[in-house]
Amino acid sequence: TNGDNDTFPLWYCQETEGVRTDARVCNLSYLQTDWYIDQMKRPAYDSPAVPIHWSRLEYVAGTREGTSVRPGTLEQVMDYYKDDPETLKQMVGDNPYELKNIIDHWVLNPNPDLRIIPTDSIVVTIDKDAVRRSGMMMAGDSIPDVMHISLKGKRAVYKSEMMMYEMLAQCNWERPLYVAITVGKDNYGNLGNYFVREGLADRITPFNTKESGKTVDTDKMYDNLMNRFRFGGLDNPNFYLDETVSRMCYTHRRLFAQLATQLMAEGKKDQAHKL
């Protein structure tokens, strides 16, 4: 999540109503701070800790607030690989483009001068068996070997985004990561091309859904909207709709319209009509 209006109601549901205490709500606005990262690294309710493996000294306030993106550095690195590949692999890992290597060997480097991202084109190597076990929709003809994250045009990656990348690097598709649909594109961490909508949240997948066009998991979204979500109160003429609540209602209407359109495109007309 990103703002108060899409976060506090979820905290209420978990804290007071005991709903989905196995899931972890993470507010990206707070993820720039060390005290909130501390909380994310601890279990809460029935949820295990968020997969952030940094030590506190590595993210304490004033440290790694922003990591410069310097794509020109990669040319030098590749030249070093040609000259002395074994030594360089020990220093910066097997693949200079790989997200986990970049975090471990560059971003977390003890030398402040080397705490950079040496490329604007990052890859995440995909564990295909883990993807098959994950239960996510296969949003492509085949599972890709790698996932590409483009940082073109970015001058720096700030701490909250870096924490998102750390979660992605560590989770290995065994724990699903979602972004609320109310989060603005500026906070996607350049991962928007890999989202699959399942309801009020988009699941991060290894599939480039912008290329495949498979951006909606109609089975999960239909089940959520028709069976799992609870709606009520709007038929009460005395119910006050303020600006914020009105926007939320419009968001839900758009969800139904989007799902109906996709169901029709997939030939599932009966389900579309039930919406």
Enumerate the language-model features and the residues they cover.
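ER/secretory pathway lumenal C-terminal domains and tails of membrane proteins involved
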Residues: 2, 6-275
